[in-house]
């Protein structure tokens, strides 16, 4: 009897141990956190939104090889949704230094191409380069370790190619860096979710850099202190937020002796540079001789499979599968490919969606994105988000947007253009009409499977309601209710209304094009 009890107790301990390892290796898991969602508690009184604004960045922080642009997230819509928006402009050859945040985020590449690195705690270094270093740069290693190092080359975690139209997610606390190896500026916009349950701090988003230093950041801190002394509450709060987003080199706070003891093979000068002393380059620096071997799309799957086989050959059969599940996650999905459109109307435009179905990591981050392309004068909506807030970032063209809130009043009715962000809270109905040059935008949302409900069209809510119910709801005849219900046969994206003259003109053009 005692033997059975001991065996049962041992099995329970083993299960608990494996569960703890899984939780430790995968801290971004989707879960219903037991603690109250601090964002909803603190911001619910700030969601009484009477007016929305389409805004551009309010702060610019210059670095040696680029600019960091920050939106004012103290406006009612930003505070309500918990969104924080940042745009990075990296010049050719520029390197956005390694950093992490206390909140998950999703990035959209608006322009250019580059290389992205992701560092996941506990995952192996499955990538290697052909770089060779002289012995003096390797430190005092044994001959055996030197021979192993020279045979392997430089090893590191995964890197991948990024280009225009890519959506790149990042969990809280995971280090990422970006290098522009193209011939034009690499521009990306990032949306951080301060209300995420992954953020264990307050409603502020913080950036933590592993290198560099920002002279402008020091100036912001001095300006912040002066603002506090002058009693400017809003300006002081905005300065606090900007300082947190600009971040600082976390190594600069450690003493030289501690760092020298940790990194024993480096000299005092290197320790000083680790701490960013006298470094005025900012957090986007000009990289020197940065040659990275990046697998192209067709190679990435092969490299991943080869890495799995190598680990199996080294005896990784003892693995419980956690490494394969977590370390091989995909961190990129392109939403700018017409052939992958989820909704397409040849006369109106298209919608591409990236969510947890085609990018599984988004399930754990509770984020997703849509890329919408509208042709000349085309219309989308009215529609609303059932389970998410959204931030619309305009990438091309111009158009008119109308948003209606819960009081049945318009909270936004204006034109939008490239570079602007419009935050739309959950449930607010939106209609967008493109201008003469068309309109393109990306919608970043705080749900991994955000659902929209259109009011018009073949998949609309009105289409799903019986004609008699519509007739009584709007006090109209059943004939008019039928027309209302079935007037549009398109799905979500609608071609513009055409007069009889315009229709005849279009038919004439089609006839000549066929001839």
From Swiss-Prot:
This protein, when mutated, can potentially be applicable to the development of transgenic hypoallergenic crops of tartarian buckwheat and specific immunotherapy to treat tartarian buckwheat allergy. Destructing the native conformation of this protein significantly reduces its allergenicity and it may be a candidate for the development of vaccine that builds immunotolerance in individuals with buckwheat allergy. Production of mosaic molecules which are reassembled derivatives of the protein may have advantages compared to production of modified fragments. The record marks 163 as: Critical for IgE-binding. Residues 1-22 form the signal peptide. Disulfide bonds join 47-80, 123-327. Residues 52-272, 333-482 form the Cupin type-1 domain. Homohexamer. This is 13S globulin seed storage protein. It comes from Fagopyrum tataricum (Tartarian buckwheat).
């Amino acid at each position: 009897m005692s033997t059975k009890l001991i065996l049962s107790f041992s099995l329970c301990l083993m299960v608990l141990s494996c569960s703890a390892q899984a939780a430790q290796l995968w801290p971004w898991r989707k879960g219903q956190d037991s603690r109250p969602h601090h964002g909803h508690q603190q911001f619910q009184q700030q969601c009484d939104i009477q007016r929305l604004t389409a805004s551009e960045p309010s702060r610019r922080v210059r670095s040696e090889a680029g600019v960091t642009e920050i939106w004012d997230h103290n406006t009612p819509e930003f505070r309500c949704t918990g969104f924080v928006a940042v745009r990075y402009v990296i010049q050719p050859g520029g390197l956005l230094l390694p950093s992490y945040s206390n909140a998950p985020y999703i990035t959209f590449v608006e322009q250019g191409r580059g290389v992205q690195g992701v560092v996941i705690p506990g995952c192996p270094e499955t990538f290697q380069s052909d770089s060779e270093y002289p012995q003096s740069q390797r430190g005092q290693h044994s001959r055996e370790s030197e021979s192993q190092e020279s045979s392997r080359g430089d090893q590191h975690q995964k890197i991948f190619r990024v280009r225009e139209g890519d959506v790149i997610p990042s969990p809280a606390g995971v280090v990422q860096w970006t290098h522009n190896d193209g011939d034009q500026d690499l521009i990306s916009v990032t949306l951080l979710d301060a209300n995420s349950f992954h953020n264990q701090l307050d409603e502020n988003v913080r950036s933590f850099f592993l290198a560099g230093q920002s002279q402008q950041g020091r100036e912001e801190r001095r300006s912040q202190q002066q603002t506090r002394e002058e009693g400017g509450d809003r300006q002081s709060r905005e300065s606090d937020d900007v300082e947190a987003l600009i971040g600082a080199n976390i190594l600069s706070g450690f003493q030289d002796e501690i760092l020298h003891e940790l990194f024993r093979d480096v000299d005092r000068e290197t320790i000083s540079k680790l701490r960013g002393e006298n470094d005025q380059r900012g957090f986007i620096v000009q990289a020197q001789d940065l040659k990275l071997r990046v697998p192209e799309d067709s190679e990435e799957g092969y490299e991943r499979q080869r890495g799995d086989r190598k680990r199996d050959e080294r005896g990784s059969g003892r693995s419980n599968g956690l490494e394969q599940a977590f370390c091989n996650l995909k961190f990129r999905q392109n939403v700018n490919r017409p052939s992958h459109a989820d909704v397409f109307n040849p006369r109106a435009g298209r919608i591409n969606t990236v969510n947890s179905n085609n990018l599984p990591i988004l399930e754990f981050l509770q984020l997703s994105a849509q890329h919408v392309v509208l042709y000349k004068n085309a219309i989308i909506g009215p529609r609303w988000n059932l389970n998410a807030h959204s931030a619309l970032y305009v990438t091309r063209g111009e158009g008119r947007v109308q948003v209606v809130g819960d009081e049945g009043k318009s909270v936004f009715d204006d034109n939008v253009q490239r570079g602007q962000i419009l935050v739309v809270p959950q449930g607010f109905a939106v209609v967008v009409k493109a201008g003469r040059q068309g309109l393109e935008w990306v919608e970043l949302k705080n749900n991994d499977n955000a659902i929209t409900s259109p009011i018009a069209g073949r998949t609309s809510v009105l289409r799903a309601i019986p004609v008699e119910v519509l007739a009584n709801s709007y006090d109209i005849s059943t004939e008019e209710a039928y027309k209302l219900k079935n007037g549009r046969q398109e799905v979500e994206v609608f071609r513009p209304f055409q007069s009889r003259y315009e229709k005849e003109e279009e038919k004439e053009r089609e006839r000549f094009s066929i001839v």
